Regions:
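Long, well-ordered, tryptophan-enriched scaffold segments
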Residues: 103-105, 118-125
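Catalytic cores of secreted or luminal carbohydrate-active enzymes
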Residues: 143-187
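Mobile "lid/hinge" segments at catalytic clefts and subdomain interfaces of large enzymes
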Residues: 126, 131, 135-139, 153-157
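Active-site/substrate-binding loop(s) of hydrolase catalytic cores
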Residues: 1-88
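Extended non-catalytic domains of envelope/secretory-pathway proteins
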Residues: 196-224
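Divalent metal-coordination and catalytic microenvironments
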Residues: 27, 55, 132, 163, ...
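Conserved small/polar residues in nucleotide/adenosyl-binding loops
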Residues: 225-231
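Phosphate/diphosphate-binding loops
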Residues: 110
Length: 234
């Protein structure tokens, strides 16, 4: 018989498994730290392919409904305002797909966009990041407080419709998004950018292997100096 009680073992994950690698490290916190081999592989693909959008489809507590963007404050100030604008557009069009089917959802509430170690790392490379979370149903579905049973098939349908809505939005707005991307990248390397004429100094210590590993992971132009240079600490 189906077990729709979300307190049962069927609906309970085996801690700490589920979202960690075999080192028990949460890979959805590692995107800019790059401590894990899986993360370094993901980031290398993002930096190589530079996708226009990156979708992160999650699950959450079974007694919730469906979370979609845009995120709430605080927002990281290093994220381009154009990406924030498009996040609102995509969310509204995804929400319209849910409204059409009378599905419950909420937006702009509990998840913020400050920490760059989530999959939203893609936004710092110019790609729009989309997160949504479906209440977890497992195999048999879950009885909700009002007495209805939401099935696993319904939860998959929500994720599928969300993805298709995002792809339809991308097809509609792709050219305008490319123009914003080009303008933003061009500005960021211009003399007017807040990043213009800036260098970052890392003081070396006796652990040369650790320094070499950091340089490799940064994948950025690096030079070494043995001179004493004046610096301004900010």
């Amino acid at each position: 018989a189906p077990n729709v009680d979300d307190q049962s073992l069927l609906h309970t994950g085996d801690w700490p498994f589920g979202r960690t690698n075999h080192y028990f490290f949460d890979l959805n916190r590692d995107f800019f730290l790059l401590t894990q081999p899986e993360t370094r592989g993901r980031v290398a693909l993002i930096n190589t392919w530079r996708p226009q959008i990156m979708i992160d489809g999650h699950e959450m507590g079974s007694q919730s409904t469906f979370l979609m963007g845009p995120p709430r404050q605080p927002l990281n100030t290093n994220i381009d305002t154009d990406l924030q604008k498009w996040a609102v557009t995509f969310s509204e069009e995804q929400g319209a797909a849910f409204d059409k089917r009378s599905w419950r959802y909420f937006t702009g509430e509990w998840f913020e966009n400050w920490y760059p170690g989530y999959s939203n790392y893609s936004e710092y490379r110019g790609s729009m990041h989309i997160l949504y979370e479906q209440s977890r149903m497992a195999e048999d579905g879950v009885r909700r407080p009002e007495g209805t049973v939401q099935t696993y098939m319904e939860s998959v349908h929500h994720q599928f419709v969300s993805t298709m809505a995002n792809l339809e939005s991308l097809a509609t707005h792709s050219q305008a998004m490319y123009r914003d991307y080009w303008d933003g990248r061009k500005y960021n390397v211009s003399a007017k950018s807040k990043f213009a004429d800036k260098s970052y100094v890392i003081l070396a210590n006796d652990n040369h292997g650790r320094m070499a590993a950091l340089v490799e992971r940064l994948d950025a132009p690096v030079s070494y100096t043995h001179l004493t240079l004046p610096t301004k600490v900010t």
